[in-house]
Amino acid sequence: MRGGLRHPKQAWSDTRLVQACLDGDADAWIALLAKYKNLIYSIAIGYGASQADADDIFQTVCVEFFNGLPALRRVESLPAWLASVTRHRSFHWRRLTSTRATREGTTLEDAPPTRLAVVEDDVVERAQRDQRIREAIDRLPPRCRRLVQLLFFEQPPRPYADIAGEMGLALGSIAMIRARCLKKLQSAIHEAGL
């Protein structure tokens, strides 16, 4: 797949991914981290981390995630747990950076301004909403799921002719099938409480 979902398992529910991770599926780990990478990076950068420092924070969170996943009691709390771990690691990074700057004779006032911020609840809520949408897509019949992925998750967007060819459909039928699939997706999203 070009762009969009990088890994087929990324569309799996967190419950399914967590179980696969606990069963030793390396691809499930890759998919689970890909799903929450933006959440982790947004928190680290919100604490003023550079890209390199955010990379380090991400790696530290991944290690803690790997070690802590077997103890996770409720999969639904995964985004909030990851946000909490990331805030803690980002705060720790910020404290070390501040201490190092003080030893080197600079102060935080001398440093460029940063957005030292506690991630707002809406970031976690957005991650949870996105997860419920991915789960709704995952519940679609295979043809609808694939069509939704091709139409809405590919970057750059692909022409209908390419999609029709890949799926073995008549070009003129794509719009009608798309409408039916979107209606099914709307029902699945409604069932998910969105």
Language-model regions, residue ranges each:
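Structural recognition of an alpha-helix C-terminal capping motif at a helix-to-coil junction
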Residues: 56-63, 76-88, 176
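DNA-recognition helix of helix-turn-helix
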Residues: 87, 91, 160-191
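Short amphipathic alpha helix immediately N-terminal
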Residues: 33, 137-162
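Internal acidic/polar
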Residues: 10-11, 100-123
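Short amphipathic alpha-helical boundary/capping segments
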Residues: 16-21, 132-141
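Arg/Lys-rich amphipathic alpha helix in sigma70-family domain 2
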Residues: 70-74, 84-105, 126
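Short, charged helix-capping/linker segments at alpha-helix termini
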Residues: 2-8, 22-30, 41-60, 71, ...
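C-terminal flanking helix
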Residues: 37, 41, 62, 145, ...
